[in-house]
């Protein structure tokens, strides 16, 4: 924990760790020497069985071989898109691109043709690496349709066809010099509020952020981390993959999030750490109650992407007898901004998102004047430091709007900071509810509702109203099979907050529409309501 004495909602970068001037490829080469025979990667296949594995020496060898292949086919700085689930080839391509000076563009394997085409076209990708199908999605057919007329895309490669994946091209096969400030990836924002933008992330941003994360999550060379977060997101290919790399520990890569399979692998492979959004953790607990497993090896569970209910934290700590932390960030910051410490209290874990990461300045600023606000005052969370994206790809206007002239990246998230430097998130600027001229912050209302025993997950949104402009509405996923009681929840809210913040419309849902990173798509809930899909209780 940092023992800080700020005078306002501003924490300057803490120098308890250094920013290393290093590329992803540099790290792989370092660790392959230091931990040559240690297991780096273990595959878990679709059926939940373990498959192929690599030592760090083998991982470097295959990555360098693939890098030479890519260098013979593409020029340094060109962009290639990976459109695949969590398969080992994904990681090989990530490392090979880093070694070859290529920019990796990530795409969600659930995309349909228009979504895929947007990413390919907006990024200017010259190649598409994919699996032919995944979970019923005919990806090869979709790719053919998506690339019609896209002259920039020179080839479509099936990553399961290693002859095609590793083939040599016509160019000289020489690996170039790559610099820490060079672009490593273009990650498309998950779009909780609209169309995605491509955040260009540098090698030094991704590598240092992942190291800071893994260190605060107590990773060691003896750790074994489960990775069931999507590789197309910075959590999967950044925090976990590059975090494990820098500690030379073992990563178990799950092709599919299957709670029962994950619990079996936790037992058989002695998993010590994992990261999951709250929905995933709930599913693991539900599966564990049906089919018990020995999960005593787990030392750390980390969650992010949404506020965590106190009951969920207690249940995880009881079931796994482990430490629990939450993290907060966004794609544009590579991705982490704050993280808890292992010794933090359950109150801090549930009411805040922790303290800033090392070498990261964080401030809470007024939206109107861009000035730092007093403690415990809602404003926009802003970030300054090594972790900030280079730009939004081919979008100068959005880049200028996101990063001001002083280098502060404006996250679009509303939050507060207390006198210890702990940050709380109260919602998105664009999700703030304005009822009769008064600002309502969804996260504040959600946190109150998460304390109710019948509430498993919740999303509070503003819905249009002729009288008030907007009214507060609440979508609930129940903790039991029983229907929720709106009157009971209304009473709970009135006992814990002002009456105008209490939802006036209640909806029960079986599942929430989620982004690829597990965040609730609140604008979609609003749109579905307006189209008549939801009826209030």
Feature-to-residue mapping (PLM):
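Conserved AMP-binding/adenylation subdomain of ANL enzymes
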Residues: 207-224, 232-273, 283-287
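Conserved ATP/PPi-binding loop(s) of AMP-dependent carboxylate-activating enzymes
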Residues: 355-359, 371-402, 440
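Conserved AMP-binding/adenylate-forming core of the ANL superfamily
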Residues: 37-95, 112-117, 164, 177, ...
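Gly/Ser/Thr-rich phosphate-binding loop
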Residues: 271-276, 285-348, 361, 370
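AMP-binding/adenylate-forming catalytic core of the ANL superfamily
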Residues: 68, 111-117, 121, 128-130, ...
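Conserved pre-ATP/AMP-binding loop-to-beta segment of ANL
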Residues: 21, 36-39, 170-188, 195, ...
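Structural core segment of the AMP-binding/adenylate-forming
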Residues: 102-166, 480-482
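Conserved AMP-binding A3 loop
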Residues: 52-57, 184-208
């Amino acid at each position: 924990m940092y023992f800080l004495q700020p005078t306002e909602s501003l924490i300057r970068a803490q120098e308890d760790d250094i920013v290393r001037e290093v590329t992803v490829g540099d790290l792989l080469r370092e660790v392959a020497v230091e931990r040559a025979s240690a297991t780096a990667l273990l595959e878990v296949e679709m059926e939940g069985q373990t498959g192929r594995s690599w030592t760090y020496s083998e991982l470097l060898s295959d990555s360098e071989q693939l890098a030479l292949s890519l260098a013979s086919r593409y020029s340094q700085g060109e962009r290639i898109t990976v459109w695949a689930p969590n398969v080992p080839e994904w990681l090989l391509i990530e490392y090979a691109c880093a070694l070859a000076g290529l920019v990796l563009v990530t795409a969600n394997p659930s995309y349909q043709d228009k979504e895929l085409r947007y990413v390919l076209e907006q990024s200017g990708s010259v190649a598409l690496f994919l699996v032919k199908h995944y979970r019923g999605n005919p990806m090869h057919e979709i790719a053919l349709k998506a690339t019609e007329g896209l002259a920039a895309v020179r080839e479509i490669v099936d990553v399961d066809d290693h002859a095609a994946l590793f083939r040599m091209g016509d160019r000289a096969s020489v690996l170039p010099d790559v610099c820490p400030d060079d672009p490593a990836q273009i990650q498309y924002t998950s779009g909780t509020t609209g169309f995605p933008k491509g955040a260009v992330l540098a090698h030094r941003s991704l590598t240092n952020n992942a190291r800071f994360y893994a260190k605060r999550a107590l990773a060691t060379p003896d750790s074994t981390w489960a990775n069931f977060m999507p590789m197309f997101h910075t959590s999967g290919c950044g925090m976990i993959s590059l975090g494990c790399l820098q500690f030379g520990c073992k990563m178990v890569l799950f092709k599919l999030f299957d709670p029962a399979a994950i619990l079996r692998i936790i037992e058989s492979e002695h998993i010590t750490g994992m990261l999951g959004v709250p929905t995933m953790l709930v599913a693991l607990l539900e599966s564990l109650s049906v089919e018990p497993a020995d999960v005593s090896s787990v030392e750390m569970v980390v969650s992010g992407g949404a506020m965590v209910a106190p009951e969920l934290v207690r249940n995880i700590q009881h079931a796994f007898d482990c430490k629990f932390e939450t993290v907060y960030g966004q794609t544009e910051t590579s991705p982490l901004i704050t993280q808890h410490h292992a010794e933090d209290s359950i109150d801090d874990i549930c009411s805040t998102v922790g303290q800033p990461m090392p070498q990261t300045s964080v401030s809470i600023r007024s939206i109107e004047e861009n000035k730092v606000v007093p403690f415990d005052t809602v404003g926009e969370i802003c970030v300054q430091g090594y972790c900030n994206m280079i730009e939004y790809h081919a979008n100068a206007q959005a880049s200028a709007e996101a990063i001001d002239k002083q280098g502060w990246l404006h996250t679009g998230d509303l939050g507060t900071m207390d006198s210890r430097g702990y940050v709380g998130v109260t919602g998105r600027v664009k999700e703030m509810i304005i009822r009769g001229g008064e600002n309502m912050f969804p996260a504040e209302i959600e946190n109150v509702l998460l304390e109710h025993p019948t509430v498993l997950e919740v999303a509070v949104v503003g819905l249009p109203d002729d009288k008030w402009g907007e009214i507060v509405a609440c979508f609930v996923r129940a903790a039991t099979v029983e229907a929720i009681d709106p009157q009971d929840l209304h009473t709970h809210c009135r006992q814990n907050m002002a009456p105008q913040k209490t939802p006036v419309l209640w909806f029960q849902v079986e599942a929430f529409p989620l982004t690829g990173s597990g965040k609730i798509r609140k604008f979609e809930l609003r749109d579905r309501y307006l189209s008549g899909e939801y009826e209030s209780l």
